[in-house]
């Protein structure tokens, strides 16, 4: 544990593990004071691991596609085919229309978020220890989905797709009419309708982002508290059962994000009918 190596307090240990490696875009220097808040500060550790996991996902699926065989499949090909079939079935159950983009999008969202969540199961001190004492990096957080900036970015992408499909299917006039003439179909209620529908529309990406962030951040915090508060010989008693339970949580959160994305897009088709 870093706490034992540095002889720091439990508070310092927890604070260190919740600190990001940040870059100040004003002068392109690393931020030495994590308490500084600015729009021009990037959590470069979250961005790095998000991109890295995305590349790993693409490489695995590209390799599987290149080596796929119609004969006896490899274990990797079997897993990928099961995942593709599972996602495709769920998308078809939700979206009752032909769209070649939605299933690949759902697969990408599920696998990418699952890989980000999976980083939460790594040993709490492993990568931060390597970063500090070998690479001389002052801080490092390795779970991208425990960063609200990442989950909001993902949700923003979903929100753009929701707007795009609403405009594509209903047209600008139809979309504006939906925002202003529902739920009360009278001209006098246009301001009220617009407020209600706008809140409903904006709540979709916000709820997606906060749900994913809250669950994964809480799981990360529990692991840090176990490592920071308990003696080393007793940590396994709690951390192993929590890790087993957390496997369900990280999978479920990736699945929920994926399903709700498809549901929100499907609503554009259903409401048009």
From Swiss-Prot:
This is ATP synthase subunit a. It comes from Baumannia cicadellinicola subsp. Homalodisca coagulata. It comes from the Bacteria. The lineage of its organism: Bacteria, Pseudomonadati, Pseudomonadota, Gammaproteobacteria, Candidatus Palibaumannia. Belongs to the ATPase A chain family. Key component of the proton channel; it plays a direct role in the translocation of protons across the membrane. GO terms for biological process: proton motive force-driven plasma membrane ATP synthesis. It holds the Pfam family ATP-synt_A. The chain crosses the membrane at residues 41-61, 101-121, 122-142, 143-163, 183-203, 221-241, 247-267. Its main location: membrane. It is found in: Cell membrane.
């Amino acid at each position: 544990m870093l706490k034992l190596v540095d002889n720091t307090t439990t508070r310092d240990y927890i604070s260190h593990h919740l600190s990001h490696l940040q870059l100040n875009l004003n002068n392109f220097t690393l931020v030495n004071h994590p308490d500084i808040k600015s729009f021009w500060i990037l959590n470069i550790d979250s961005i790095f691991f998000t991109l890295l996991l995305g590349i790993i996902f693409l490489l695995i699926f590209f390799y599987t596609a290149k080596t796929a065989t119609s004969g006896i499949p490899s274990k990797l090909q079997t897993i990928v085919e099961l995942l593709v079939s599972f996602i495709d079935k769920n998308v078809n159950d939700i979206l009752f229309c032909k769209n070649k983009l939605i299933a690949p999008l759902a697969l990408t969202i599920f696998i990418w978020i699952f890989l980000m969540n999976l980083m939460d199961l790594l040993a709490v001190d492993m990568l931060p220890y390597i970063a500090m004492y070998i690479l001389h990096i002052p801080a490092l957080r390795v779970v991208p989905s425990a960063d609200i900036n990442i989950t909001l970015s993902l949700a923003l992408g979903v929100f753009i797709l929701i707007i795009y499909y609403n405009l594509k299917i209903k047209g600008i006039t139809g979309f504006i009419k939906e925002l202003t003439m529902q739920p009360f179909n009278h001209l006098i209620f246009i301001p009220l309708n617009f407020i209600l529908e706008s809140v409903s529309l904006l709540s979709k990406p916000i709820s997606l982002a906060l749900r994913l962030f809250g669950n994964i951040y809480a799981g990360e915090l529990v692991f840090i508290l176990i490592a920071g508060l308990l003696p080393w010989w007793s940590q396994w008693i709690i951390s192993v059962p929590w890790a087993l339970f957390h496997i369900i949580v990280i999978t479920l959160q990736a699945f929920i994000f994926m399903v709700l994305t498809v549901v929100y897009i499907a609503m554009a088709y259903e409401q048009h009918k």
